[in-house]
Amino acid sequence: MRAALALRGRVQLVALTSSPDRVPALRAAGITPLVADLDVPSSLGRLAGIATRVLHLAPPANVEGTGWWRDARTVALARALRLRSLPDALVYGSTSGVYGDCGGALVKETRAASPHTPRAHRRVDAERSVRWLGRAGVAVRILRIPGIYAPDREGGTPRERLRKGTPVLRSEDDVYTNHIHADDLARACVVALWRGGTQRVFNASDDSDIKMGDYVDLAADLYGLPRPRRIAREQAGAELPLSLLSFMGESRRLDNTRMKRELRVRLLYPTVATGLQPPKTQSLP
């Protein structure tokens, strides 16, 4: 929605939604709703030829059993878009999780994907599907997105985690994490619709160089809350949910040079230290 609002009044906007309940809100925002479902390919016929530029941010469905690694949603979208005239450009919001664990190394877009989790495998499959469109002449740009945060986003800061007293790893066991403010991600999505080479991958990350525990400590200090306990990795398995443990198994530092140089994205919030503060407004680059 942030990217759409940034473009409002500049282009005609159409949003795909599977929920009829969202139609009034989309119309109120000046966006033409198209009710269809990526999980129901037969509903996608009206997508063909409807747009010259496409922003695809739908996550893969969680699938178990046969085909657990496939992203059928992106396959369905790509097939629908090929039914008539292709769009000029498509931007896909992937995840930095496709790199897997890099041992805290600095990661450029040229590093081979090495997904460790089912959701990351599905993102790799989605990237393959949009590259297929690229071979057909669409200017495809893939944004590999880390953790998205924003004080005005539901669950967009560690505040609730701090209130629950969820512990973090001690420094010697901790992992590097990567972040992007929701407003800066929206800016990157918008400019990528027009800028950048085709079949190009971009790390859509800010300039932070920070470990997970230090990020949570920073938030605690900013919000006047107690810093969390530090625990050893051996203790984490007994105290933390599996969803959080999976993020603690991967450490990497994203290099965002290509995004800033080729997309010419100017970050409103270069680090989490500035981004965790109350929001501010600035025009798109």
Predicted features, each with a name:
Residues 131-177:
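NAD(P)-dependent short-chain dehydrogenase/reductase
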Residues 103-142:
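Catalytic helix-loop patch of NAD(P)-dependent Rossmann-fold dehydrogenases
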Residues 47-91, 128:
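NAD(P)-cofactor binding segment of oxidoreductase domains
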Residues 237-266:
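Conserved C-terminal active-site "lid" loop/helix of NAD(P)H-dependent oxidoreductases
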Residues 27-52:
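Conserved Rossmann-fold cofactor-binding substructure of NAD(P)-dependent oxidoreductases
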